[in-house]
Amino acid sequence: LPIHTSTQMTITNVEGARLLKEQGVERVVTAREMSLEEIQRIHDEVGVELESFIHGALCYCYSGQCLFSSIIGGRSGNRGRCAQPCRLSYEVMDEKKHPVKTGKKERDLYILSPKDLCTVSMIPELIENGVDSFKIEGRMKQPEYAAGVVSVYRKYIDYYINACLRTDEVTAKKDFKVTKEDIQHLYDFGNRSGFTDGYYKRHNGREMITLDKPSHTKGNEALWEEIKEQYVRSEKKEKINGILRLKKDCPAKLEVALNDIRTSVDGDVVQAALKQPLAEEKVAASIKKTGNTPYEFAELDIDM
């Protein structure tokens, strides 16, 4: 089983990644707090597979290492049970514990609440700097959110890779653009007072913090309903190929294949029709009724 390490191991440098590779790790999920240059350095000097977060919630502390939730409520962030106290409002005080005037009421100041990460416009740079796998944060999110966000990123990853194949990386990167409509879709799927590109291009930044509204808001209910119809309510079925053999005085036999997996089943002995013989089209229509199973026929041959 390939070993992948979590972002909660807080791997932020070459030395940490190299140690894990020596221990047999095949893929490192980098800390969210890393820059593009730091990721590039691990890629160049260690040669381990790298997976990085590209969208979703950011942690105020190093990912998963915050003890705030554990201390005040016994819910460990490093076990995926963070109560997110960073989303509450706090008063700012100076070293003498005097309130600092911020122009906002205490209850309206969210100084520990980061905005959500969004890097769809950085896809060429992320690939160029050595990210092998993109990770979208989706803990406790609705299926519509996951489906919608993934569909936007999938669109532009494929767009960029296909452009590289048609031309070259320099031209593809130069021509890469994300439409305002798709950016708005990402906002509608959910955001916290807008988006940030996190630490990829800067160490820290005031614009990373929500300050005003820490809640995860969504918009455009029509878009959510469209995503629900397209991805959530409609069950995706695997395409299978089959052949039905119907020979007189022999058991009926159905052979089915899904990629490299093959199986077959025998039925009753086929007998000659007393009156109206079965038409091939009618037999095929009956066999293709797969009901509530997760399969549907791509091809079905009838040998009779």
Residue ranges and their predicted role:
Residues 2, 18-304:
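Surface-exposed amphipathic alpha-helical tracts and adjacent flexible/coil segments at the periphery
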Residues 1-19:
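N-terminal active-site wall of soluble small-molecule enzyme domains
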